[in-house]
Structure formats: C-alpha cells, structure tokens
C-alpha cells in the first residue's frame, strides 16, 4: 500500500515511538487536513498535545472495537501482531501496516524491485554491517542513504531529492515481514545469522526464524546473500533469487585474522576498528555485498580501516585507573555476550555484566561455553539475573567469581571491586533487553558511560545517518 492510498481513509497510528513519529510526519506532509487518530500512553499524550494538531485525535485506551473502526492502522514495530489484542483486532477486521511497508511500496519499480535497496538483517551485527556498507559505498563515490532500524526511520526519507544511488537499510525481525508484506523486493537482501531472540514478540523461536527469513523467502530479492557458516541459513533453498554466500573458502572469508577473497589475502582485520571474530565475518558480508553489486570490493576493502564504530556495540569508552570500559549495551542475546567475551578472554582480565529483561531466552549455551573460556568475574542483574545466577552457580566454584547485583550501578561497583588494583576490562554486554529498567539499550549505554565517568553525549551519536 502506497501512502497516497490513505487519502480519504479512516487512519490511526498505534504507538508513538520513533517509527510512529516518522509515520505521523509523512502522513501530515501528504494530507495536512485529513483526520488522524493516535493510540498512545498517557505520558506520550502530553508530548503529542504540544503539536497542536487540530485534526489529530489522541486516545490513551486501545481496544478491539476501536482498532477495527479504522480502515488502516499504522502500527509501531514494537507492537507485536501476535499479541492477543492485535490478533483479536485483526479477526474483527482491523488492517495493520507498518511504516517500512509504506516506504517500500512507494519506492518499488513496475517489477516490484526497489532499485539500489540493500536490506541487512540478522540476529546480531546488522547495525555495524549496514553502517560499514554505507561507509564503503560512499568511499566508492556513490551517494548512499543509511537508514532503517539503525536510527533513522525510512519514512523520514520518503521523497528525497535527489534520490541516492543506494539505500543501506537495516531491518529488525519486526520489520522484515513488513517488507515481505509490501509486495516490493529489495535489490539485494543480506542475512548475517539467525539465533533465537525477541521470542516474546514473535511468540516462539520458529516464528521468529520465519519472520526474520521472510526477507528472502517471501520478499524474493533478485540477489540473496547468506552466511554459509550459519547452519540455519546454509540449508536454505531460494529458487527465485540469485543465491550467493560469504564465509566460504572460495569467496569472502576470514583465516586467522586476515580477510581473504578465495586464495587472495585482502585485509588484516587488526587494522579495522571492529574487534572480534564476528566482526571479521561482518566485513566479509559487506565485501561480498559490494561484489554482488558489481563493485571492486578488493580495491574498496582498505577503506574499512577508517570506519567509525557505532555506539553501544563493543564500544571502547576509554581507560581509567587501569580499567578499560567497554559498552556493548546492544547485546540482547547470550550469543552476543559470548562473541563480546571472545574479544578479550585470554588477553586481559574481564569482569562482565549480564542480565536484563526476561523474555524467555535460554542461557544454557552461555553456561556451556563459559566453563571452557572463563572470565574473571560475572555479575548478574535485571529480571533474568536470578535465573542466570542459578544456572551459573554450580559452575562457578574455583573457575570464576559470581555476583548478584540489584541494578546497573550496583553491578558496576561489584565489577570494579572484583577487578581490583590490577584492573582489566569492565564489559557491559547484558545479553538481554533493557525494558523495565531503561527506555532502550541506548539509555542503558548512556547510564553505563556516566557510571564510568565519560560524557554520554560524546559517545552516543551515530555518524553517517541519512544521505551522503
């Protein structure tokens, strides 16, 4: 559905997050005088009233009859379509769409393909990969948009003039189904990996996987690029796409710490400001994408060395009193925490802070790995902290210190004490969302920076968003 199709319709917005605010602005730009209803919280209503929009109605209670009363409801991506309320409303006739769906429908050619659109998804690494892709496309002299889940909703760039040559678009699992439902197809879809995450939103592991992979299984991009080292991805068959791979020995892959194209050594990952083996894989994904787009990836690879890392993603805040403070607040799965630990274990003493909102993710994989490569200390916190603590307690004796904190300040204090005068790495890599304690992972990362004694404003901006 194109945004022009909303003219004269009864339209509502559900939610008032970043994506919904972008949808509001896009709707108002198209239809300045058309009535619109917003379902939001009481706290959000106060902010919205300041807009002084005479044809905007604000409702702080949402129900099945009210949702079903509209022709179209533009839903915030954070609201699950599998929630009882959304399911009941759909059964009653409510029609939900998302902002991502509106953008893709607006930009599709007659064959359904959005020219120059490269969509990146995966359980972890997608923000860094998308930003690095935009960085290298710009290094090649191509006007490129960096947008999507990374921090700039696509609807903020609905009708840019002039249009960029390429769109580097990060998509969450909440948004991939939006693309699939739009009827449009990205020119290239890149899937980095798939681990269980957001199980509360999707209602189970298999549905999460299906929704995530709908970007390639349902949207049918002309080119699909997948990680050959991921078992779930390696088994995919996509007959309607030109299927390509990275992390294969005859293509882009890492050996030791060097990026190779087949047998050709291309780039030493030690020169790139992205620590960890998983980031070597992300670099390969980007270079394989450039190659699939017809660009000289080997020649462009050295430009990765001046990439500016993103905040909250294995971000080195700085060193104070012998302690290196590392902010990996984006980490919302145990797999991500393990990848973060791999950057430091065996090199420096590490105290890691884990735990947060409990959405039912299994931490047994973390427990199994942690006994083979152990940090100095683990501090648990948050709603799932007691669960992680109980899982690790039988394994800790004689191997690593294990502490329980009531919140992030307490966790930081415990970790500092554990590291002591010898210092080491104090790593925030929670492996869980921030809900309940913070608005989002960004706010959690900012609080961590404050506790570490660093200016949160300096460390929290993402460079390169938008068109350049």
From Swiss-Prot:
Location relative to the cell: Cytoplasm
Catalytic reaction annotation: UDP-N-acetyl-alpha-D-muramoyl-L-alanine + L-glutamate + ATP = UDP-N-acetyl-alpha-D-muramoyl-L-alanyl-L-glutamate + ADP + phosphate + H(+)
GO aspect biological process, one term: peptidoglycan biosynthetic process
EC number: 6.3.2.53
GO molecular function, one term: ATP binding
Biological or metabolic pathway of the protein: Cell wall biogenesis; peptidoglycan biosynthesis
Family named by the database record: Belongs to the MurCDEF family. MurD2 subfamily.
Designated name of the protein: UDP-N-acetylmuramoyl-L-alanine--L-glutamate ligase
Lineage: Bacteria, Pseudomonadati, Pseudomonadota, Gammaproteobacteria, Lysobacterales
């Amino acid at each position: 559905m194109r945004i022009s199709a909303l003219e004269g319709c009864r339209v509502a917005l559900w939610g008032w997050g970043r994506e919904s605010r972008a949808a509001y602005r896009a709707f108002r730009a198209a239809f300045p005088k058309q009535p619109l209803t917003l379902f939001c919280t009481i706290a959000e209503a106060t902010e919205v009233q300041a807009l002084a929009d005479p044809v905007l109605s604000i409702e702080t209670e949402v129900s099945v009859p009210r949702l079903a009363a509209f022709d179209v409801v533009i839903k915030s991506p954070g609201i699950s379509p599998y929630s009882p309320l959304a399911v009941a409303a759909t059964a009653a006739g409510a029609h939900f769409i998302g902002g991502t769906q509106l953008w893709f429908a607006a930009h599709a050619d007659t064959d359904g393909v959005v020219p120059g659109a490269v969509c990146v998804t995966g359980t972890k690494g997608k923000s860094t990969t998308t930003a690095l892709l935009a960085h290298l496309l710009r290094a090649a002299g191509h006007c490129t948009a960096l947008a999507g889940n990374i921090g700039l909703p696509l609807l903020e760039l609905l009708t840019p003039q002039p249009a960029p040559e390429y769109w580097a678009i990060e998509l969450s699992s909440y948004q991939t189904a939006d693309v699939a439902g739009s009827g449009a197809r990205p020119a290239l879809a890149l899937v980095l990996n798939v681990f269980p995450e957001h199980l509360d939103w999707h209602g189970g592991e298999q549905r999460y996987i299906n929704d995530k992979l709908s970007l390639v299984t349902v949207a049918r991009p002309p080119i699909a690029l997948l990680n050959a080292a991921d078992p779930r991805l390696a088994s995919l068959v996509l007959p309607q796409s030109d299927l390509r791979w990275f992390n294969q020995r005859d293509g882009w892959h890492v050996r030791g710490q060097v990026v190779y194209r087949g047998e050709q050594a291309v780039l030493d990952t030690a020169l790139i400001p992205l620590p960890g083996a998983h980031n070597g894989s992300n670099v390969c994904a980007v270079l394989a994408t450039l190659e699939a787009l017809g660009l000289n990836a080997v020649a462009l690879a050295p430009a990765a060395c001046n990439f500016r890392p993103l905040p909250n993603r294995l971000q080195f805040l700085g060193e104070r009193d012998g302690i290196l403070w590392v902010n990996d607040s984006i980490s919302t799965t145990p797999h991500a925490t393990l990848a973060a630990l791999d950057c430091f274990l065996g090199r420096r003493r590490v105290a890691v802070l884990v735990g947060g909102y409990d959405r039912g993710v299994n931490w047994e994989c973390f427990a199994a790995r942690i006994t083979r490569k152990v940090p100095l200390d683990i501090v648990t916190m948050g709603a799932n902290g007691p669960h992680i603590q109980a899982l690790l307690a039988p394994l800790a004796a004689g191997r690593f210190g294990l502490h329980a904190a009531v919140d992030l300040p307490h966790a930081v204090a415990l970790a500092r004490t554990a590291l002591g005068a010898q210092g080491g790495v104090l790593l925030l890599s929670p492996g869980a969302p921030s809900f309940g304690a913070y608005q989002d992972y960004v706010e959690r990362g900012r609080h961590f920076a404050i506790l570490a004694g660093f200016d949160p404003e300096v460390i929290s901006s993402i460079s390169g968003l938008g068109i350049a």
